A protein has these predicted regions:
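Short amphipathic alpha-helical segments with heptad-repeat character
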Residues: 9, 13, 46, 50, ...
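Aromatic- and histidine-enriched alpha-helix N-cap/loop-to-helix transition segments
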Residues: 14, 37-40, 44-51, 136-139
Length: 212
């Protein structure tokens, strides 16, 4: 992991901490309430973020080993995973979100330099180098945190993310959130006390790296 990749990984850590701080105080009614994404509750958004981390970890492992390990078995399996996760309790869903984020981070931090250049793909997308997974994960966390509708908005984005140069699909998605922000009024969910930190330096059992 070079300096630029480590900086991206650090930004993902910080974005994940902000997300988990909010996830920890979401109540059952809050979780079942609609998100800002049509047809999805807040639980769906959090489940999507957890499964997204697993999918990107799969691709990092594929880049490292050379063995086929698809992000998702199929589009249907992806959707089914989100639906299953959305039915979990707030505590279980937050744990799932934190565990999947930690597992992705661990594999990314240990990835050999040459593996970052290996082409990977998500379902039927065009191949792209594995190093782009870091940017994709950061964008996914920041944008979907806004989609929760808990008060986090583009105005809360760190300057580095707001100014980051992105390829067109991700750039357009970020612009969409900026355009929609003015019309969205959502109450901020605040932790009732200082939240316990998400510890990105915690070591995971080795079996988590390749079997979750």
């Amino acid at each position: 992991m070079d300096a630029a990749q480590r900086q991206l990984s650090d930004q993902i850590d910080q974005a994940t901490q902000r997300l988990i701080d909010v996830a920890r105080v979401i109540t059952e009614p809050d979780l079942r309430a609609p998100s800002l994404l049509p047809g999805w509750t807040r639980a769906h958004v959090l489940a999507h973020l957890a499964r997204g981390a697993d999918a990107m970890r799969n691709l990092l492992i594929e880049a490292r080993t050379g063995h086929n390990r698809p992000a998702y078995a199929s589009a249907e399996a992806r959707d089914a995973g989100i639906e299953a996760g959305a039915g979990r309790t707030p505590s279980d869903l937050t744990t799932d979100l934190a565990d999947s984020a930690m597992a992705f981070r661990t594999v990314a931090r240990q990835l050999p330099d040459d593996a970052w250049r290996v082409p990977v793909r998500v379902l039927n997308s065009r191949p792209f180098p594995a190093h782009q997974l870091l940017t994709r994960r950061l964008v996914e966390v920041e944008l979907h945190h806004c989609d929760l509708g808990t008060g986090y908005s583009p105005g809360d984005w760190p300057t580095a993310f707001a100014a980051m140069k992105l390829d067109k699909p991700m750039r357009s998605q970020r612009e969409d959130r900026l355009k929609n922000a003015a019309s969205v009024q959502a109450p901020k969910l605040r932790p009732p006390r200082p939240p316990a930190p998400w510890n990105p330096n915690q070591r995971l059992p080795g079996s988590w790296l390749g079997t979750r």
